[in-house]
Amino acid sequence: MKAVISTVSQASVDVRDDSGEVRRVGEVSGPALLALIGSGRDDDADAWETMVRKIAELRLFPASGEPWGGQRDLSVEEVGGSVLVVSQFTLMGKTKRGRRPSWSEAMPGPAAEPVIEKIVHGLRNRGIHVETGEFGADMQVSSVNEGPYTVLVEC
């Protein structure tokens, strides 16, 4: 399992429905995180729990009054922030050979969707406000990164 996690002042995700209408399905504002999460075919059964802990507890925010370029002392949980979770199987793409990514290491959609749902519920159970994209949909994700401060988390 991999996640690209960015501190954001705002982030949103829109989905185009069957009629062609674009609708907003999730939106957060700072302090907040945008978490793009991909599940791997060989992920451990408890990888989602580790991911919940990492997203909730990683110290990605500066202490109150500290500049954004300074040391990071607080987690999204500690600052009372929000998380926008977007499923992103393309994070599992392999690009070592050729010009077309291979998705062979990505967890198939029917198995990956409940894993992403477990992460969302796990974060909410910790008292974190969570918004989501729409699993399997063609989404438009927008964000205003703070810093920018982005980390890759692998579980």
Swiss-Prot record:
Keywords assigned by UniProt, alphabetized: Cytoplasm, Hydrolase, RNA-binding, tRNA-binding
Taxonomy, superkingdom: Bacteria
Main location: cytoplasm
EC number: 3.1.1.96
Keyword RNA-binding set for record: yes
Subcellular location: Cytoplasm
Descriptive protein name: D-aminoacyl-tRNA deacylase
Organism listed in the record: Corynebacterium urealyticum (strain ATCC 43042 / DSM 7109)
